[in-house]
Amino acid sequence: MKKLYKIDENVILQNGIIYDPFENKKYKSDIYIKNGLIKKIEENIKSNDGLIIDCNNKIITTGFVDIHAHFREPGQENKETIKTGSMSAMAGGFTDVCIMPNTSPPIDSPEAIRFVLDKAAALPINIHPIGAITRNQLGKEISEIGGMVKNGAVAISDDGLPVVNGNVLRFALEYSCNWYLY
């Protein structure tokens, strides 16, 4: 997991409302972070060891996941890039983002998946590319699903464009089961 950002000093988040989605609990507490790792969660942590951030009545929780985002790169960088989309996502509390393949050209090949992941490698959040079901999202022939998965695609979608040919869709769905895409 990537760190969202590097803080060169220790941090105490004071008076935050911690929400634990796994336990479905909320409680007020402090969090002590040393060298980027949570070391202590308890009330009234006292320390002169670093930055103190008052989180009075603000919610502290795990990062959010966006399973349907449009970052528009490659081809439509005037709308959004992988970098600008990542920075916006991070500012909103998202640590993981699945990006749709409706770019120009579409993300429909192993090379396109690698392009996205190479661009995302140095960014502060985790990018999960979704590959196109069909080449160029035209609905006529399936894309290189296996190659895309081997290179990091987490799902397939033609994102808003129907695969009208039932045989093409059926073949794509059956084939995707070989790659544990359900």
Task: Please place each PLM-identified region on the residue numbering.
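Metal-associated gating/positioning segment near the N- to mid-region
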Residues: 58-120
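N-terminal metal-binding scaffold of metallo-dependent hydrolase/deaminase domains
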Residues: 1-47
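Active-site metal-binding motif and surrounding structural segment of the metallo-beta-lactamase
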Residues: 44-61
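Divalent metal-coordination and catalytic microenvironments
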Residues: 16, 31, 36, 57, ...
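Hydrophobic/aromatic beta-strand patches that form the interior of the parallel beta-sheet core
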Residues: 13, 51-53, 65, 98, ...
